[in-house]
Amino acid sequence: MLKKNIFIVVLLLFWVRIQAQEDNSVFQFLKLPFSSHAAALGGENISIIEDDLTMAVHNPALLSCVADKTLNLNYTLYIAGVNAASAAFSRVLGDRSTWAVTAQFVNYGTMKETTSENIITGTFSAKDMAFSGIYSYDLSDYWSGGVKANLIYSNYDKFSSFAIGVDLGLNYYHQNSDFSFSMVARNLGGQIVAFEDKREKLPVDVQVGITKRLSHAPFRISATLYNLTDWKNSKFFDHAVIGMDFLPTDNFYVSLGYNFRRTNEMKVADSSHWAGFTAGAGLQIKRFKLGAAYAKYHLSTSSLLFNLSMTL
């Protein structure tokens, strides 16, 4: 009980500390979905209880659900031809603890370098990287907590930056009712080396989420509130994501999601052209798990995310 209370107090203290932060942060790639399942449920989910290592990147407390010696590989085809790859590996420590390591790489390709008169003077490349360690602990039969430490590096042409960040997660799960509640504070930390003279903030994100499986139907409903420290020029639903899983068997799911902010920000001529809608599916074949997600961002832009996990 004491450890559970400590985790709750720490999360609340960080909530108060970052309420005044402005949305002028760097390392925006940290907001990209790591999990195809989370991406399929609207892009944000911190409360799905599954043996899914990728979900522990969204909420480190969920690492307690992951099997020993799980290896995960991911690939994302993002908007504008941006490519991202990531990997993770987990180990169980005793009855209550689990640890994992992850790596993420985003490649923006080669771009033209031009003057203010649009004269091409050369080319340059840009990339982002993050390396993380995750630890989770079962605080009781219902509560679990987790922490994720991140080493973050970005390089854009002649400019580079290095930062250290921490994610904190807490989850409550009642197995009999199949109800899950989570709180997460992500990207707490700062730059060690700035791009230029002035240090900039990390994209801090406080989230709360719930997931409930229906008792007499093969459906699971999720709702997540995110970016709760920044309410400038935004309404309540701009912070909301909803999603639903169809679970005909224990080894297969189909997901649909909706992100209200994406719809509002990407409207063209009073039409969203399906921006904000997401979909995906997952399949388990023995010790292998496959997942895929599609997300619509704009009339002409979308993304695809693929996960492959296996138990060694």
Please give the residue ranges for each predicted region.
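Bacterial Sec-dependent N-terminal signal peptides
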Residues: 1-22
